[in-house]
């Protein structure tokens, strides 16, 4: 079902990470985040949305499905995880588009503990006035957003100008782009930022676990 994959950490804490628009669960970023979070004691589930399954099968790029379809597919994944792990404490999230879909799904699901987003698409690239903030004002669960300072979908300066609810926490990583990758001149690395993201998400999850 949707190439559902899990990396277990022998814990009752589970997080689901959905991929971004252009790369599925096979991408190095998704595999790296799954590994780093698991090392810190969280079971990590990943999956491919239906359009990405088709893209892999046909070996060609396919645009994402409409948002309602993505939300429904994510909901089906959660149902399957609940079937396999009925006692799991469950957080959801994802990279960029996947994180946005998770926020919409959390608005419909009271049993989701919280949401973790890696690079929230606050607006389309080059269209800073076309913001996607409504769902962040609707969601009731705690949300952590890990954002690169230079993210073209919403940089640190732009985010500072938003009036976000108190349950939304944004952590900006120095000089990071939409994939948390800093420039060489910064002296930092994408791997360091991914480890930092995993650490902050783990603290977020464990701090709210029963």
Write out the residue ranges for each language-model feature.
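A conserved short beta-strand
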Residues: 111-122
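Short beta-strand/loop motif that positions the catalytic acidic residue
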Residues: 138-140, 145-147, 151
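Conserved alpha/beta-hydrolase "acid-adjacent" motif
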Residues: 152-158
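Gly/Ala-rich beta-loop-alpha elbow adjacent to hydrolase catalytic centers
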Residues: 94-98, 102
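Hydrolases whose catalytic domains are alpha/beta-hydrolase-1, hotdog thioesterase
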Residues: 101-105, 126
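Short beta-strand immediately N-terminal to the catalytic nucleophile in serine-hydrolase-like folds
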Residues: 89-94, 118
């Amino acid at each position: 079902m949707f190439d559902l994959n899990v990396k277990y950490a022998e814990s009752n804490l589970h997080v689901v990470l959905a991929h971004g628009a252009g790369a599925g669960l096979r991408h190095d970023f998704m595999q790296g985040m799954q590994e780093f979070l698991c090392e810190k004691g969280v079971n990590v589930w990943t999956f491919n949305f239906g359009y990405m399954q088709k893209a892999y099968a046909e070996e060609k790029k396919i645009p994402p499905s409409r948002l309602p379809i993505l939300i429904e597919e994510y909901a089906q994944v959660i149902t399957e995880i609940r079937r396999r792990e009925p006692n799991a404490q469950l957080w959801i999230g994802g990279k960029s588009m996947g994180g946005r879909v998770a926020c919409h799904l959390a608005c419909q699901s009271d049993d989701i503990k919280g949401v973790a987003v890696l690079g929230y698409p606050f607006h389309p690239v080059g269209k800073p006035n076309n913001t996607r903030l409504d769902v962040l004002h609707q969601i009731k669960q705690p949300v952590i957003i890990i954002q690169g300072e230079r993210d073209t979908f919403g940089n640190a300066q732009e985010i500072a100008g938003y009036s976000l609810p108190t349950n939304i926490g944004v952590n900006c990583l120095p000089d990071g782009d939409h994939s948390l990758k800093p420039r060489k001149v910064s002296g930092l690395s994408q791997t360091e930022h991914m480890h930092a993201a995993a650490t902050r998400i783990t603290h977020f999850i464990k701090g709210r676990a029963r």
